[in-house]
Amino acid sequence: MKDSKESIRLGRFEFLAMNNPLRRWRWKHQEFPLFLKMLQMHEIYLSGKVIMDMGCGAGFGTELIVKELKPSQVIAFDIMPEQIELAKRRGLNVDFMVGDATAMNAPDSSCNAVFDFGVLHHIPLWRKTLEEAVRVLVSDGVMLIEEPHKMFEWTEFELGIQQAGLKILERRQWYGGFFRFFLTQKAS
């Protein structure tokens, strides 16, 4: 994947915030179970499928994907090489790489799911990133999105999701609306 200025590297504070035990606890006990519940409610099963973890950071979310969903392949990337080095230390059977979400290193229609654990708000060209996710998704592929409030005007964000070629199957608010979670599917 090419490195570009379209994605923003985390500052020191945010790097530490994303790699702390409280964040991992929230991922494991709140955020990821919510994604699992959404998938189950819509009878979407990703076991044995190809999953992309966009902006994987140190790989904690990637590890949850591997352990809980049991995909056949996981492609995980982050723009920060230091995050990828941390992710590789987890010893997972995952294709970790440094990459840019606005130019994903995957063939068209090659992934059954793309996960966004709070990455889009770091990317000025977030609409282009959504279009890239649609490009790599198979015809009925899904994208799971978790983003914080105040980073987006939600009406504009949902319109961007739809304009990229995704239909919103479900949306949920968390922590009094501070976070929003979306289960979307590539529109046919």
Q: What is each PLM-predicted segment?
A:
Residues 52, 58-103:
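Class I SAM-dependent methyltransferase SAM/SAH-binding core
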Residues 102-114:
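A short acidic, Gly/Pro-enriched loop at the edge of an enzyme's catalytic core
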Residues 113-125:
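A short SAM/SAH-binding and catalytic strip from SAM-dependent methyltransferases
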Residues 174-188:
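Core SAM-dependent methyltransferase catalytic element
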Residues 127-139:
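A short glycine-rich, Lys/Arg-flanked "PGG" loop and its adjoining helix->strand segment in the class I
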Residues 1-19:
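N-terminal, positively charged/glycine-rich alpha-helical extensions of SAM-dependent methyltransferases
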Residues 141-147:
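Conserved beta-strand signature within the Rossmann-like core of class I S-adenosyl-L-methionine
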Residues 20-37, 152-153:
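Conserved SAM-binding loop and adjacent beta-strand
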